[in-house]
Amino acid sequence: MKSLNIIFAGTPDFAARHLQALLNSQHNVIGVYTQPDRPAGRGKKLTASPVKELAIANNIPVFQPGSLRKEPAQQELAALNADIMVVVAYGLILPKVVLDTPRLGCINVHGSILPRWRGAAPIQRALWAGDKETGVTIMQMDVGLDTGDMLLKTYLPIEDNDTSASLYEKLAEQGPIALLQALEGLTNGTLAAEKQDEALANYAEKLSKEEARLDWNKSAKQLWQEVRAFNPWPVSYFEHQGNTIKVWQAHVSETISTAAPGTIISASKKGIEVATADGVLTLLSMQLPGKNPLNVADILNARGEWFSPNTRLANEAE
């Protein structure tokens, strides 16, 4: 297989894993684009992205423009004379002039089965909606938001115990393999581009902390999906006894209850059962303010009086 001269554009750890796969391949990564260094940690020290750190460790030139809309940045990119640009969770918009610069254009690795879940949070939204599968799409980029022609798709079943954290790990393994397959198909002409069906498209909006508040007026199934979707960020939570209590793990109980939504049905080391508008949600792992996440048995040892049966947990509207 012919080797390609590649510009890689990406920022977080998910992207760095794809860069590592390219570095391990026969292709030549001739330049890396990543977001400018950002303040991080308690000291707000300027911190390089995982992609930048990996590029520096491998002596690859790094470019960190604040925008690619200006001509000097575009000329700098064109001067690299790349065959193709690979984009993974970069975070900057690529104008048409940039998309058209490499000989084979720009391709993107997206963490969903397009056209479902275009946008910023596809992994989380698939869980949030109760999807049965997700996957990776390699697409030829155009000026739209994840609207380009699809070159290759992989599929991954979503298990009942999956969270955003676990799906992230699985897709971070699947994505690099799919990327290398797509590059091989592009070079030997075996990939057939497929148009996206706009009728099937929807958008994965960014998550918000407010959205993670548990509303007991929803069904137990929906709340279970939210707990999994919002792990590890922003983490589902409810207010009780003047405290914000995070919920890291839960499942739908087989218990039947006619109690008002938000009422604690039972509390034991097996879990805290809470009535919802439809069904009962069992809380398995929680986090008290200023503490680490704990299983329910340890929570009850510390604050059992907070979770006595028939106690009502406040709803969002109350």
From Swiss-Prot:
> GO CC terms on record?
cytosol
- Name recorded for this polypeptide: Methionyl-tRNA formyltransferase
Q: Which gene encodes it?
A: fmt
Q: CDD domains, from UniProt?
A: FMT_core_Met-tRNA-FMT_N, Met_tRNA_FMT_C
User: Which NCBIfam families does the UniProt record give?
Assistant: fmt
Q: Which EC numbers characterise this protein's activity in its record?
A: 2.1.2.9
Q: Where does (6S)-5,6,7,8-tetrahydrofolate bind?
A: 112-115
| UniProt entry keywords in alphabetical sequence | Protein biosynthesis, Transferase
Q: Which reaction does it catalyse?
A: L-methionyl-tRNA(fMet) + (6R)-10-formyltetrahydrofolate = N-formyl-L-methionyl-tRNA(fMet) + (6S)-5,6,7,8-tetrahydrofolate + H(+)
* HAMAP family found in the cross-reference section: Formyl_trans
Cite the SUPFAM superfamilies for this sequence.
FMT C-terminal domain-like, Formyltransferase
